[in-house]
A protein has these predicted regions:
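A conserved structural/catalytic subdomain of Rossmann-like adenosyl-cofactor enzymes
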Residues: 1-175
Length: 175
């Protein structure tokens, strides 16, 4: 990578984003040097024969002024197409992830633009999901779940009775 203008992308297992020891020291150096421009986490199984979830680290020795002091973190673990033997990223999936990076703004469930100070406060952990705001699922009370369950059970019983009646009328079963 050229000292002043070099850029590169490195594919790594996601563990490098949060493991301690030497990996933690390397993360700290990347953050403090402000060379880390973006992180994209991928779904497991994108790379044939490797079930481990991967990430791509984008390094840039000449970050644009608007990106300095920040890291773009993208969770692309839900942006893929499932195939029988492996998960793939179609051209459309890749374009969607690329657009998140180009837009360079936080998007709930997918992307966060994180200040270096925030990363320092979290001990240089780069686990993308700890920075991206997630949609809160509505909370349903146990009483409501129970009520809906028994309503659905009654619907199943009514459908079963109607089916039995039709089968009896058609002579398929004896009542």
């Amino acid at each position: 990578m050229k000292r002043d203008t070099g850029r590169c992308a490195v594919v790594m297992p996601q563990g490098v984003l949060f493991h301690g020891g030497k990996e933690g020291e390397i993360r700290k150096q990347l953050i403090e040097s402000d060379k880390l421009e973006a992180i994209i986490t991928l779904v497991g199984g994108v790379f044939y024969g490797a079930g481990v979830s991967a990430c791509i680290l984008f390094l840039n020795n000449n970050k644009p002024a608007s990106h300095q002091g920040k890291v773009c973190m993208i969770d692309a673990s839900t942006i893929y197409t499932a195939k029988r033997a492996q998960n793939i990223m179609t051209e459309e999936d890749i374009a969607r992830v690329y657009q998140l990076w180009q837009d360079y703004r936080s998007v709930i469930d997918y992307c966060a633009i994180v200040e270096l100070e925030t990363i320092r406060e979290k001990g240089y952990t780069l686990s993308v999901n700890s920075y991206i705001e997630k949609t809160q699922a509505p909370t349903v009370s146990p009483a409501e779940v129970r009520k809906k369950f028994f309503e659905a059970l009654e619907e199943v019983k009514a459908a079963e009775a109607a089916l039995t009646q039709l089968l009896e009328e058609g002579g398929y079963i004896n009542g």
